[in-house]
Amino acid sequence: MAINPRISEQYRYGSTLDRISNVKSIADDINETAISGRKLKKISDDPVATIRVLRNRTRITNLDQYRKSLDFGRGFLAKTEDALTSISESLIRAKELSIQQSNNIYDEPSRKAVAEELRQIINHVIILGNTTYSDKYVFGGFQTTQPPVSPDGHYLGDDGFIFVQIDEDSFRPININGRTVFDVPGGEEGKRPPLVNILENMYSSLFTWDRDKLHESMVDLDSAMNSVITATASLGARRVALEDVSERLDRGESQLHSDNNNLEGADMVKSALDLKRAENALNFTLQASSKMLTPSLLEFLK
């Protein structure tokens, strides 16, 4: 059975066109890789690598959220620590004044002048007790929207702890129990006298010159100072821990970006060589096909 010359000619043209189209497609793909600098442009390029890249991107997004929580926690801790440091300095000054006056060598005008300085210290401690960070009261526990220390010095907060998420299934507390600072352990009959009340007792004992009451207040003040020191130390340890977490998150994100660059990024030297080979292959294919194609069709394909 004879082969139809027209069919044979059509098959020859079709095969040539397919061959040129395939070579040109490869060259275009390599050229796009060289221009974009990325070797993963669609999932079919490397399904396993693409899935890994997507997982890394999700992890990076999560790390960004954890870092925001971490930054908030660090700021909250720093503001609380600054307030405690100022409270500690105020209590040290109050202790110095009470020691001076307890020697009974000062006259009444001097004692009243010292009492007025104590009044300023009391007001300052109340202000510090109502310190806020990002519109949240740092000493109130869960009660972050209302002042935890009343004008008369009573603690109005609760014993709740505020946690921030710093990683998957990992949470850290960023506040202290304000009651441990503003309701002082010990005191008469095991009660917890409010910190401000201790200072108020010192103030009134100087005005009325009640040495016994002044000495009792000094004992309570020592307990208050120890409570503030303990709270400050615990905050310092938490702050250092969060700094360590921050560094770990930075390292983790850097590794994820590096991994994605290795998976997605094209080797530019290799891409340049591949592009040159593809161009040569295309030129060779066009030259080899020119004998089988009419000049007009060949020009159209170029």
Regions found by a protein language model. Give the residues of each.
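Amphipathic alpha-helical polymerization modules
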Residues: 1-144, 204-302
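Cysteine-poor, low-complexity segments in flexible/peripheral regions
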Residues: 147-208
